[in-house]
């Protein structure tokens, strides 16, 4: 039986690579947290994926998916293939992204924040065979940003439209 961290890693790898999605579990008896994982994978994304460390490691640990829907953003995955918890660091430049400031949201935990090449995202004690799954959006001054949700692993295709319009001004006399 796979641990929750291992199920999340397997789901992340399949989702990020657009792999075949086969749900062979008995869905009516599946625990709610695992059913939620399956739900977050649909619809399947069929976009080109970049495996960043394809030739650098026995088990690639960094995957990048570029999304262009209602806006442009990146989905990054970082894996811990070790048999014990490890700290993971996600630096946008190491994922071959432009240096700059970004907002992020981690899918499995809901953690949100900001990062840059000088201030990468740090995750403490990622479980053995676990992963982090991040939506990364460039920070634009004076502009509202959608950070993501837990509806779909991409943290963005669930949006039909994102409007960044100033609030109407009201004059009080």
Feature names for model-found ranges:
Residues 113-116:
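Short beta-strand segments within Ig-like beta-sandwich modules, predominantly Fibronectin type-III
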Residues 1-109, 122-140:
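Active-site-proximal substrate-binding groove within the catalytic cores of carbohydrate-active enzymes
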Residues 121-173:
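Non-catalytic C-terminal accessory domains or segments of carbohydrate-active enzymes
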């Amino acid at each position: 039986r796979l641990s929750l961290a291992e199920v999340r890693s397997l789901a992340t790898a399949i989702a990020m690579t657009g792999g075949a999605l086969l749900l062979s579990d008995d869905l009516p008896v599946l625990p709610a947290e695992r059913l939620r994982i399956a739900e977050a994978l649909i619809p399947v994304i069929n976009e080109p994926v970049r495996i960043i460390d394809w030739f650098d490691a026995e088990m690639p640990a960094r995957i990048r998916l570029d999304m262009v829907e209602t806006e442009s953003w990146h989905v990054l995955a970082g894996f811990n293939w070790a048999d014990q918890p490890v700290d993971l660091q996600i630096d946008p430049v190491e994922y071959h992204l432009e240096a700059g400031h970004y907002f992020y949201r981690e899918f499995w935990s809901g953690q949100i924040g900001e990062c840059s090449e000088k201030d990468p995202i740090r995750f403490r004690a990622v479980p053995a065979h676990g992963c982090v799954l991040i939506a990364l959006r460039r920070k634009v001054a004076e502009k509202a940003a959608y950070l993501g949700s837990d509806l779909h692993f991409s943290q963005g295709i669930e949006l039909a439209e994102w409007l960044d319009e100033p609030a109407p001004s009201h004059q009080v006399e």
